[in-house]
Design a protein with these regions (language model features):
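Short beta-strand element of Class I
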Residues: 106-111
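Conserved class I S-adenosyl-L-methionine
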Residues: 83-90
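Conserved SAM/SAH-binding beta-strand->alpha-helix loop
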Residues: 114
Length: 225
């Protein structure tokens, strides 16, 4: 059954972007799913599944972040001490949450407004709870604009999950949290189409990766004021 999903995903990427990217993506999808023992590849149209909140028109399709990009980002973050608490906005089926545990994060939260995706995320991180018993995993099924950021969360992950309206609201919540509890914050943003929102809010880009034209990752930071 998973082989069928790989074919569909390869075709989806090839038709919409390029077949070179499709072959690259499928290679890393198969490698990553096997390496981390996950089931996160299947595409989902959000309009066909149950959504919590009123912001579905600000989102479109569930698609997990490419494993190559994800691992490169976490490898960079490993060099920066103190990054242990991660929030994944639009966590989907929990790929980022699961992989983050392998890179030393001890508190990992995923937020998504699609109930079916949250259930899938719970299933995927369940194995990681056994593998990393000291790591706290929490999947929250809610609209990200309603999420109350924890005072010690310092890494925030995005994979272009929302449009500018939702992203502005989430960035505002992050800034409010940083003012209330001053700390260094890091943004890990794959396919960063709204990167300017963070830069305008005082974040500085520390790392940028671009692969095969379409795969992009930006890591930005903001020091405590």
């Amino acid at each position: 059954m998973k082989f069928i999903y790989y074919i569909k995903y390869w075709y989806f990427i090839g038709i919409n972007w390029s077949f070179l990217l499709a072959f690259f993506s499928i290679y890393h999808e198969i490698k990553g799913e096997n390496k981390y023992d996950l089931d996160t590849i299947e595409l989902d149209r959000l309009k066909t599944i149950s959504i919590k909140g009123d912001n579905i028109h600000h989102s479109s399709i569930y698609q997990a972040c490419n494993y190559y990009i994800l691992e490169k980002g976490f490898e960079f973050l490993e060099k920066i001490k103190g990054n242990k608490n991660l929030a994944d906005f639009g966590c989907g089926k929990g790929r980022v949450m699961a992989v983050a545990a392998h890179y030393g994060f001890t508190k990992i939260t995923g937020i998504d407004f699609a109930k079916a995706l949250c259930v899938a995320a719970e299933n995927n991180v369940r194995k990681k709870k056994l593998l990393f018993p000291s790591t706290s995993f929490n999947v929250i099924c809610d609209d990200v604009v309603n999420y109350e950021i924890e005072p010690d969360q310092n890494v925030f992950f995005f994979f272009n999950p929302f449009d500018e309206v939702i992203m502005l609201a989430v960035v505002k919540n992050i800034l409010l949290s940083l003012r209330a509890n001053p700390r260094k914050a890091l943004i890990m943003y794959a396919n960063p189409v709204h990167k300017e929102i963070f830069l305008s809010a005082g974040f500085i880009e520390e790392y940028y990766l671009r692969k095969l034209e379409y795969l992009e990752l930006s890591i930005m930071s903001k020091e405590p004021e």
